[in-house]
Amino acid sequence: MPSVQRLVAAGLLLAVTVVGCSAPSSQSSGDKGQSTRKVPDKPSKPVSLEILDVAGNLQLTQGMIDEFQKTHPEIVSKVSYSKAPAPELAGKIKAQQQAGRVQIDMVLTGTDGLAAGLEQDLWADMSTHQDAIGNPDYLPPAAEMAKLAQGKGTAVVYYPSGPLFEYDPAKVPNPPKSPQQLLDWAKAHPKRFQYADPANSGPGRTWLMGLPYLLGDKDPSDPEKGWDKTWAYLKELDKYVDVYASGTSETMKNLATGQVDMIMSTTGWYINPRALGTVPKKMKAGHFDDMTWVTDAQYAVVPNGVSADKMSAVLNLLHWMLTPEQQAKAYDDGYFYPGPAVKDVPLSMAPAKSQQVVKEYGVPEFDTWIDQFPKKPSLSSQAQVKAFDLWNRQVAGQ
């Protein structure tokens, strides 16, 4: 039976459990009057912003933020950044709100931290400030992901994600075209295929959420009652997997060193590690026939209790970040390929370095695949946590 680290899954599950068990408190979300009191077009004086990243998002957006501060010192005098694991986010924000001292002005988060804050009503209502943010001309799949924020967050980057697989062509001359072919290959080559704990891996999570579409399960949105084929498949595949990696980087290392020959991947995870030299350039990416992309996005949220002046600065910043010129920076080094959440941001608008990385380490067919196959948003975070728990008990723990 494969071993697996369940730390992140446990943390996410605990966060949701705490949410469900917490008694209501009049101070649980700090000053909720933010959405109703007047926010000026610009701060009364330049403000410093404290930005917390729990999603690795700064790799994509810090250039946008830093340029805004340099261009608009009359709005933002200084930006300070910090990072934390997503499972710690809700507790950190709630503690500041209950103390009446909100020190974090904006959070960059994935769906996990977004949902934990929604459950505890930690995030300010951004829908009342839509005129200040503008109306981003989102790509349709990004618009669907934006809805997960329920008006209390702003999608700032997007990518179709996967599921894709990555392999050594010298060891896998005939890559699989279906999950069944992958299972057959794994059976013939035990311990040579690997994916990471879905709770702590984008490729692992996308593989888990993409299988119900590939296998024709009853309800891809319901891991508990609608994934019979997926759970049966993963239990069978489990027989031929040696160890479930604790995170995606571990699978990349194992592929690079020849410990395994095929792993699950995404567009960004295929491009970026090869560009960084941690995975040999010779590795190839593949997709399954008739796949469905399971999309992903990252968000900016503002804690309740932030001052009107700081909210004004954040709104100006978000308006800036969602312009096509700034969105082009999201191509980065392929980390979230493509990256932009809004329409009409071709690679030709990206910085020269980004264009070179994608040209040298990307896959020309990626754009074809993105256009060719349907796209569905990720599960809600609550449903993801249920899926992680079921995977731990029914697959990794069997």
Task: Give the label of every model feature segment.
Residues 300-371:
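Mature extracytoplasmic/periplasmic domains
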Residues 37-115:
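Early extracytoplasmic/lumenal segment of secretory-pathway proteins
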Residues 164-171, 212-214, 296-310, 329-330:
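A bilobed periplasmic-binding-protein/Venus flytrap-type ligand-binding module shared by bacterial periplasmic
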Residues 114-116, 262-281:
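A ligand-binding cleft/hinge motif common to bilobed small-molecule-binding domains
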Residues 54-63, 86-87, 103, 108-250:
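Extracytoplasmic ligand-binding site segments that recognize negatively charged/polar headgroups
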